[in-house]
C-alpha cells in the first residue's frame, strides 16, 4: 500500500489554524511581550512549538501504516542508504525506533522545532513533505555511526535523544541519507609558494566546498607582491589575486551543496602583504581588491606583542627569501625564535611597519567588519602535544592541528602527499552531561561517535585530506550550554564559582576523552601515526596532572560534582592513565575543540558554545518566516539575574572563563569578544593583549552591540528592555 499524506499543500511556513487557535508564529512573537504582570511569557513559546506540530508538521508529514512499510519505501526510493541498514537485522532497527519513540521527545522551543524541520529532517525530493520525525533522524545517525555495533547504536540513541551529545550539523543532517554530503564540518589546506600548489588548492577548495564543508587555507608561504619570479624582480602579484580566485571558487561551489560555500584565509602578521591583506575588508576598499565573502585570519607570534610593548617597528620578511635561507616554508619557521637572526640576515628582504600601528589597524578593521580572526601562534604551538608545527586555524578558529606540505607535478598530480586537516565535530550539552546517569560513558560514546565520522570519511578527491584523516583519526569534541547550566545552578557567568566549574568540568572531560581514545587504541591494536613522537608518548603531557592536585576551589562546585555523582580524577587516576597511554597509545591524534555551535544549539536547547548569551531573548531572522524569538535555556521569571548578556559581562570574565577551559583542550575554542557601542579600538587592543597574556589560543569574531535604535524601543518589548 503506498504511503498517504494528510494534507495537499507543499511544506511552507504557513499552517492550518483552527478557529479560536493562535497561529504558532504569533504565539512565538508573544515571547517578546510582557504579560499584564510584567512577566516574560515563556509558556507562549512552548505553546508555539506545540501548535507548529498541530498546524504544520503533522499535516505535511507522509503517513505510513507501519515501520516496515516506511523503511521499505525509503530504501526502495533511494532516500535511505541501504548499506547502512543492511548492517542490522530489521527487528533490531524497529526495536531501536521503538526505543527512540519511547523517550517521548518534545522540542522545548519553537525555534528548535522550526530549525530541525527546515534544515535537518529528510524531505521528499520535491521538498514538499516531511519523511522523518526527530526520532527517525536520531536513529539513522546512530545506525550510521555505530556501523553494525548494536550496543553502540542503542547508547547513541540514548545520548542524542536525551540531549547529552549532539553531532555537528553535517553529521546530523547527512547520516544515513542516500543523497547526501559528507559528515565532516570543515577542512584546512596549505598552499605552498608555487603555481602547482596554488592551482591544486583552488581545485581542492571546489571539491571540498561541493561536499558541504567550510575550507580554510594558509597563504603565509606565498611570496609577496613584487617578489621575484625566476630571479626577475617585481614579478609576483602577492596574495590578493589568490584570495580573489578562492572567493569566486566558493561562490560557485555554493550552487552545488545544501550549505553555503564558505572559505577563510590565514596570513602571518610578518608577511609583507599583511596590510594589503587587511585592506581587502575595508568598507571603502577598491572593488579590484575588496573581499566580501572570505573570512580573514591573522597569525600573530609573541614577538609582535613584545615589539608593540616596546613601541618598536616590526619587520616583515619575504617568504620567498626565508624559504631559500632556511630550506622550509615561511609558515614552518618560528618567527619569534628567528626574528633577530632574520633581521640581521642580508639575504632576506624585509620591510618594516610600526608594531603598535599594526595592532591599531587590526582593531579598526574588527570594528568595521568583525574580522580578522586571530591565532596566537606561539601559545598554540607551546601547548600542542603533537610533533610538528600548527600554522593556521579554520573557519571558526577552533581547529588547531599539525599539517605538512604536499608536492605536485606539472600536471597537478601529487609528487608527495602531505597532511591536511578535516574537522570531525560534535558537542556535549554541559547541563545534560552533568545530569548523565554515567558521565564517563557519555564522553566515551561521544568519542566513539566522532571516531566513526573519521573512520567513515574518505575524501579521495583531495588526497592530502584523506591522508591526514587516515593518519590522525583527529576529532573535536565540543561543549555547549555552559551559561545555561551555570544560570540553572544559580552561578554567575565569569564569577569565581563559574570559572572554578569550567576548570574542573573540562579537566574531567579531558581525562575521560583520553581514556576512551586509549580504549579504542587497545581494542584496535593501533594508534595515530606519529604517536611515538608526541608528548603523550614521552609522558610530558601528563606532568601537569600527575605533579599537582586539581580539585574544586569552591564549596558550590565541589557539591555540584558530588550531587551529580561524578568522580573528579585524582593524581593516581592520571598516573594509571599515563601508564596505559604510554604502553598502548591513543587512537585519535586530537580529541577536543570547542566550536561556536549555531543551529545545533537551538535544536539541543543550549546556549551556544561556552560563551554567555548575547541576549536573554534572542531574535533571529529565519528565511521567509521572518523574526523568530528564542529564550535562553533554563530561564524563568525568577532567575533572570543570572542571564547577564555578553555585552554586560565584558571581555575579561569571558576570557577568564575560556582560559580555564583552554588549559585542558588540545585544540582551540571559538572565542567571540563582545563590546558595547561605546568601545574604542583601544578597548579591542586591550582585550587582545589580555587574551594573549591569559593563554588564549585564538580569537573569533568581534561583535559590537548596535545601539542605533536607542530611544525607539517598543514599550513593553522584552528583547529591547532586558
Curated annotation (Swiss-Prot):
InterPro entries, A to Z: NrdE_NrdA_C (IPR013346), RNR_1b_NrdE (IPR026459), RNR_lg_C (IPR000788), RNR_lsu_N (IPR013509), RNR_N (IPR013554), RNR_R1-su_N (IPR008926), Rrm1 (IPR039718)
E.C. number: 1.17.4.1
Disulfide topology: 186-423
Residues flagged as site, Important for electron transfer: 700-701
Site residues (Important for hydrogen atom transfer), renumbered to this chain: 186, 423
Site annotation Allosteric effector binding: residues: 193, 223
Annotated catalysed reactions: a 2'-deoxyribonucleoside 5'-diphosphate + [thioredoxin]-disulfide + H2O = a ribonucleoside 5'-diphosphate + [thioredoxin]-dithiol
Top-rank EC class of the record's enzyme: oxidoreductase
One of the record's GO molecular function terms: ribonucleoside-diphosphate reductase activity, thioredoxin disulfide as acceptor
Residue numbers marked as site, Interacts with thioredoxin/glutaredoxin: 717, 720
Binding site for substrate: 169, 185-186, 214, 394-398, 596-600
GO biological process assignments: deoxyribonucleotide biosynthetic process
Other facts noted in the record for this chain: Pupylation of this protein has been demonstrated, although it is unknown if the protein concerned is the product of this gene, of the identical gene MSMEG_2299 (AC P0CH00), or of both genes.
Family label: Belongs to the ribonucleoside diphosphate reductase large chain family.
Subunit structure: Tetramer of two alpha and two beta subunits.
PANTHER family: RIBONUCLEOSIDE-DIPHOSPHATE REDUCTASE 2 SUBUNIT ALPHA, RIBONUCLEOSIDE-DIPHOSPHATE REDUCTASE LARGE CHAIN
Purpose: Provides the precursors necessary for DNA synthesis. Catalyzes the biosynthesis of deoxyribonucleotides from the corresponding ribonucleotides.
Protein name: Ribonucleoside-diphosphate reductase subunit alpha 1
Amino acid at each position: 500500500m503506498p504511503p498517504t499524506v494528510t494534507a495537499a499543500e507543499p511544506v511552507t511556513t504557513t499552517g492550518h489554524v483552527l478557529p479560536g487557535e493562535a497561529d504558532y508564529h504569533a504565539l512565538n512573537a508573544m515571547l517578546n511581550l510582557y504579560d499584564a504582570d510584567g512577566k516574560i511569557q515563556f509558556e507562549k513559546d512552548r505553546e508555539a512549538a506545540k501548535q507548529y506540530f498541530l498546524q504544520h508538521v503533522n499535516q505535511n508529514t507522509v503517513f505510513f501504516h507501519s515501520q516496515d512499510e516506511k523503511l521499505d519505501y525509503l530504501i526502495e526510493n533511494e532516500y535511505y542508504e541501504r548499506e547502512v541498514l543492511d548492517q542490522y537485522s530489521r527487528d533490531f532497527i524497529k526495536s531501536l525506533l521503538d526505543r527512540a519513540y519511547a523517550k517521548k521527545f518534545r522540542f522545548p522551543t519553537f525555534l528548535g522545532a522550526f530549525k530541525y524541520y527546515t534544515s535537518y529532517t529528510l524531505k521528499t525530493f520535491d521538498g514538499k513533505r516531511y519523511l522523518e520525525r526527530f526520532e527517525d533522524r536520531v536513529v539513522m545517525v546512530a545506525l550510521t555511526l555505530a556501523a553494525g555495533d548494536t550496543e553502540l547504536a542503542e547508547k547513541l540513541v540514548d545520548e542524542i535523544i536525551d540531549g547529552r551529545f549532539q553531532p555537528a550539523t553535517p553529521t546530523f543532517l547527512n547520516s544515513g541519507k542516500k543523497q547526501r554530503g559528507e559528515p565532516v564540518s570543515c577542512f584546512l589546506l596549505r598552499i605552498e609558494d608555487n603555481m602547482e600548489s596554488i592551482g591544486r588548492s583552488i581545485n581542492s577548495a571546489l571539491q571540498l566546498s561541493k561536499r558541504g564543508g567550510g575550507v580554510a587555507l594558509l597563504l603565509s608561504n606565498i611570496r609577496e607582491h613584487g617578489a621575484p619570479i625566476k630571479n626577475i624582480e617585481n614579478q609576483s602579484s602577492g596574495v590578493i589575486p589568490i584570495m580573489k580566485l578562492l572567493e569566486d571558487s566558493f561562490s560557485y561551489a555554493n550552487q552545488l551543496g545544501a550549505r553555503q560555500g564558505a572559505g577563510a584565509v590565514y596570513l602571518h602578521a610578518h608577511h609583507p602583504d599583511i596590510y594589503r591583506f587587511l585592506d581587502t575588508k575595508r568598507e571603502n576598499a577598491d572593488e579590484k581588491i575588496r573581499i566580501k565573502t572570505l573570512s580573514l585570519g591573522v597569525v600573530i607570534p609573541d614577538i609582535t606583542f613584545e615589539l608593540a610593548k616596546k613601541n618598536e617597528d616590526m619587520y616583515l620578511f619575504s617568504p620567498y627569501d626565508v624559504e631559500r635561507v632556511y630550506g622550509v616554508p615561511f609558515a614552518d619557521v618560528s618567527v619569534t625564535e628567528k626574528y633577530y637572526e632574520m633581521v640581521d640576515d642580508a639575504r632576506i628582504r624585509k620591510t618594516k611597519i610600526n608594531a603598535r600601528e599594526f595592532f591599531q589597524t587590526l582593531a579598526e578593521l574588527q570594528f568595521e567588519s568583525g574580522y580578522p580572526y586571530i591565532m596566537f601562534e606561539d601559545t598554540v604551538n607551546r601547548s600542542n602535544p603533537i610533533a610538528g608545527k600548527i600554522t593556521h586555524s579554520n573557519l571558526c578558529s577552533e581547529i588547531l592541528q599539525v599539517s605538512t606540505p604536499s608536492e605536485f607535478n606539472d600536471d597537478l598530480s601529487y609528487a608527495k602527499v602531505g597532511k591536511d586537516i578535516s574537522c570531525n565535530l560534535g558537542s556535549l550539552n554541559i547541563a545534560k552531561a552533568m545530569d548523565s546517569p554515567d558521565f564517563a560513558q557519555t564522553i566515551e560514546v561521544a568519542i566513539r561517535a566522532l571516531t566513526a565520522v573519521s573512520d567513515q570519511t574518505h575524501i579521495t578527491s583531495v588526497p592530502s585530506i584523506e591522508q591526514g584523516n587516515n593518519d590522525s583519526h583527529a576529532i573535536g569534541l565540543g561543549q555547549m550550554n555552559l551559561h545555561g547550566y551555570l544560570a540553572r545552578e544559580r552561578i554567575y557567568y565569569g564569577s569565581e564559582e563559574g570559572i572554578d566549574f569550567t576548570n574542573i568540568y573540562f579537566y574531567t572531560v579531558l581525562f575521560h576523552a583520553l581514556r576512551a581514545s586509549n580504549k579504542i587504541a587497545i581494542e584496535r591494536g593501533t594508534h595515530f601515526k606519529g604517536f611515538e613522537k608526541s608528548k603523550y608518548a614521552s609522558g610530558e603531557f601528563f606532568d601537569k596532572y600527575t605533579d599537582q592536585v586539581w580539585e574544586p576551589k569552591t564549596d558550590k562546585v565541589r557539591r555540584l560534582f558530588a550531587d551529580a555523582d561524578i568522580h573528579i580524577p585524582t593524581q593516581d587516576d592520571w598516573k594509571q592513565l599515563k601508564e596505559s597511554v604510554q604502553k598502548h597509545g591513543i587512537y585519535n591524534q586530537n580529541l577536543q575543540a570547542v566550536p561556536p555551535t549555531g543551529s545545533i544549539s537551538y535544536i539541543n536547547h543550549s546556549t551556544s558554545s561556552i560563551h554567555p548569551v548575547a541576549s536573554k531573548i534572542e531574535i533571529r531572522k529565519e528565511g521567509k518566516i521572518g523574526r523568530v524569538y528564542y529564550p535562553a535555556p533554563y530561564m524563568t521569571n525568577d532567575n533572570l539575574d543570572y542571564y547577564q548578556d555578553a555585552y554586560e559581562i565584558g571581555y575579561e570574565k569571558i576570557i577568564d572563563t575560556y582560559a580555564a577551559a583552554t588549559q585542558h583542550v588540545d585544540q582551540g575554542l571559538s572565542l567571540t569578544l563582545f563590546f558595547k557601542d561605546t568601545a574604542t579600538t583601544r578597548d579591542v587592543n586591550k582585550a587582545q593583549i589580555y587574551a594573549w597574556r591569559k593563554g588564549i589560543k585564538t580569537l573569533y569574531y568581534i561583535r559590537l552591540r548596535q545601539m542605533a535604535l536607542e530611544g525607539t524601543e517598543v514599550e513593553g518589548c522584552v528583547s529591547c528592555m532586558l
